[in-house]
Amino acid sequence: MSGKSPAQTRVVVGMSGGVDSSVTALLLKEQGYDVIGVFMKNWDDTDENGVCTATEDYKDVAAVADQIGVPYYSVNFEKEYWDRVFEYFLAEYRAGRTPNPDVMCNKEIKFKAFLDYAMELGADYVATGHYAQVRTDENGIVHMLRGADNNKDQTYFLSQLTQEQLKKTMFPLGHLEKPEVRKIAEKAGLATAKKKDSTGICFIGEKNFKKFLGEYLPAQPGKMMTLDGIEMGNHAGLMYYTIGQRGGLGIGGQHGQLTSDPWFVVGKDLTTNTLYVGQGFHHEHLYSTSLDASDLSFTREMPETFDLHCTAKFRYRQEDTGVTIHVNGDKVTVDFDEPVRAITPGQAVVFYDGEECLGGAMIDVAYKAQKVMQYQ
């Protein structure tokens, strides 16, 4: 933290109209900071009935800001979001991968475009309602730690943040559990105290995912087969399926020769537009032993090349897995202590040393016993 008193320290809070960012602004105001609320409009989400949820969310931001006595603004990042997040999202699906737009949104919008905007408002820091913690050591290096609420910890989605970004960031909810945040909101009588949490990808909202994606990328139906070459039916388009997926295959009633286990997506082949399926949650083709990833980013300065044993997550809310990482610039090879199920190209692999989030990368390819996993 700077040497300034809270009253001299301007904190610009990203306010979404939800309870988490509302309580973030409230706590900072109560701690004496010079608080400004900013609502980010990242997507034109007017639905078929002409209702725009962003308008409703902004009304909630205004109501809370008025209640706690802080000025507030709205900023439009639709172009930045389209160029830096949505185009990436579509490109990943075109390539047959399963992207993580939340990681990219934090990297490019909330902690880049918004951070730049906040600095123009004279901010010393930005703050968001994420469940994560930052600690500064005696050398001035900022460490990002998991949120105290293990069920809500969001460091997975913040894993691409840099040291420079973290030095200008506050996470006031990091030490709290979600029920406590609700209680604070209710006790203060905030307009958003009982508002339900938003779920899903922000630009899809409550819309049907398949229908939404089909509006931007033409679906290419193809064959659904087992790895033994038995044709099981047709798929609606490879982009609609992810590795390890169970539902939505339309072959639930079909049994294999030896088992009545449910069917799962075990692979995709873009060259032949084939979706591969197999029976059983623990189908051997779902397990891999290592991966390659790129776009590696660390939350603090690290050597250009090094090896390290640490833990990793391959998806949100997953238990940590022991791994050894081999870093070479912005690329990393990750060897797993034990085989891992359903590694998904396009998703983030995020590294931890105990409670500290070290950073992350985007998964390119998975391996099994040093061989590229066929049809992933």
From Swiss-Prot:
Span list, region Interaction with target base in tRNA: 100-102
Keywords: ATP-binding, Cytoplasm, Disulfide bond, Nucleotide-binding, RNA-binding, Transferase, tRNA processing, tRNA-binding
Active site: C105, C202
Gene it is expressed from: mnmA
GO biological process, one term: tRNA wobble position uridine thiolation
Chain intervals for the UniProt region annotation (Interaction with tRNA): 152-154, 315-316
Swiss-Prot/TrEMBL catalytic activity: S-sulfanyl-L-cysteinyl-[protein] + uridine(34) in tRNA + AH2 + ATP = 2-thiouridine(34) in tRNA + L-cysteinyl-[protein] + A + AMP + diphosphate + H(+)
Role description: Catalyzes the 2-thiolation of uridine at the wobble position (U34) of tRNA, leading to the formation of s(2)U34.
Subcellular location, record wording: Cytoplasm
EC numbers for this chain: 2.8.1.13
Site-annotated residues for Interaction with tRNA: H130, Q347
Predominant location: cytoplasm
Organism of this sequence: Lactococcus lactis subsp. lactis (strain IL1403) (Streptococcus lactis)
Molecular function as annotated in GO: ATP binding; tRNA binding; tRNA-uridine 2-sulfurtransferase activity
Annotated residues for binding of ATP: G14, M15, S16, G17, G18, V19, D20, S21, M40, G129
Protein name, UniProt field: tRNA-specific 2-thiouridylase MnmA
Any one annotated GO CC term: cytoplasm
InterPro entries per record: MnmA-like, MnmA-like_C, MnmA-like_central, MnmA-like_central_sf, Rossmann-like_a/b/a_fold
Record-stated family: Belongs to the MnmA/TRMU family.
HAMAP family, per the entry: tRNA_thiouridyl_MnmA (MF_00144)
Disulfide bonds: C105-C202
